[in-house]
Every structure is written in C-alpha cells, then in structure tokens.
Amino acid sequence: MNIPQELKYTKDHEWVKIDGDTVTIGVTDFAQGELGDIVYVEVETLDETLDKEEVFGTVEAVKTVSDLYMPVSGEIIEFNESLEDEPEKVNEDPYGEGWMIKIKLSDTSELEDLLSADEYKEVVGS
C-alpha cells in the first residue's frame, strides 16, 4: 500500500498536501482499494467555504457511495474536473492525477490535527 511520507492524512482516509495556504485533497490508496472501481466523483461545493469534517462531495463506486469529508476548514477553490470524465484516475493514481479538490485554508492550526504517514499506517494496520 502506498502512503507517501510527505503528505498528511485523516482517519476518514483523505490525504492532504500542504502548499502554503493552499491545500490539495484526495482519497488515499487504502480508500480507493476499499471502494473498488470508482465510477463517479461529485463535488458541488466549489467556491463554498466549509468547516472541517463537513461533507464536500461524494465518490461513487460500483458497490457503494461514500461521502468525502473536509480534513480542514477552507474555501474550495478548485475541483479536478478531469474526474468527471475519468473517475478511474482516483483508482489509478490517488495521490497524483486522482486529486479531488484544492482549498484555501482558513485555519492553519487545524493542520496539527492531521496524521503523519506513520500514524496513518497504524490506522489502516499497515
């Protein structure tokens, strides 16, 4: 299982890449593996400001639909529109082309609540 050291994680299986006050968010390799083949990604919260742990979208797989949760508070400034036509990118490259949203961070102190790669490995039993 791929768990890049440079990223931060949540117990809800989202990953977070921090670049100043812009944060890129997606689902982890573990999450995409558990979901199975992803057929649809829906994010209707573009340009909205959401609080940590609010739902920002859904991901639909062959067998299930799962909510996507904000790992930190912020304004959603970008959605990876390529996922509309190619949702399988989430399965194929969850940490690269399968990213989901970018947000403008509201509260940098919330970053301290995120898990390191090693802490996330403990969550998934890796």
UniProtKB/Swiss-Prot annotation:
One of its GO terms (biological process) is glycine decarboxylation via glycine cleavage system. GO terms for cellular component: cytosol; glycine cleavage complex. It holds the Pfam family GCV_H. Transmembrane segments: none annotated. Keywords: Lipoyl. It comes from the Bacteria. Binds 1 lipoyl cofactor covalently. InterPro entries: 2-oxoA_DH_lipoyl-BS, Biotin_lipoyl, GCV_H, GCV_H/Fam206, GCV_H_sub, Single_hybrid_motif. Gene3D superfamilies: 2.40.50.100. Its cofactor is (R)-lipoate. Residues 22-104 form the Lipoyl-binding domain. CDD domains: GCS_H. The modification N6-lipoyllysine is found at K63. PROSITE patterns: BIOTINYL_LIPOYL (PS50968), LIPOYL (PS00189). Coiled coil: none annotated. The keyword Manganese does not apply. Belongs to the GcvH family. The glycine cleavage system is composed of four proteins: P, T, L and H. The glycine cleavage system catalyzes the degradation of glycine. The H protein shuttles the methylamine group of glycine from the P protein to the T protein. PANTHER family: GLYCINE CLEAVAGE SYSTEM H PROTEIN, GLYCINE CLEAVAGE SYSTEM H PROTEIN-RELATED. This is Glycine cleavage system H protein. It comes from Christiangramia forsetii (strain DSM 17595 / CGMCC 1.15422 / KT0803) (Gramella forsetii). The lineage of its organism: Bacteria, Pseudomonadati, Bacteroidota, Flavobacteriia, Flavobacteriales.
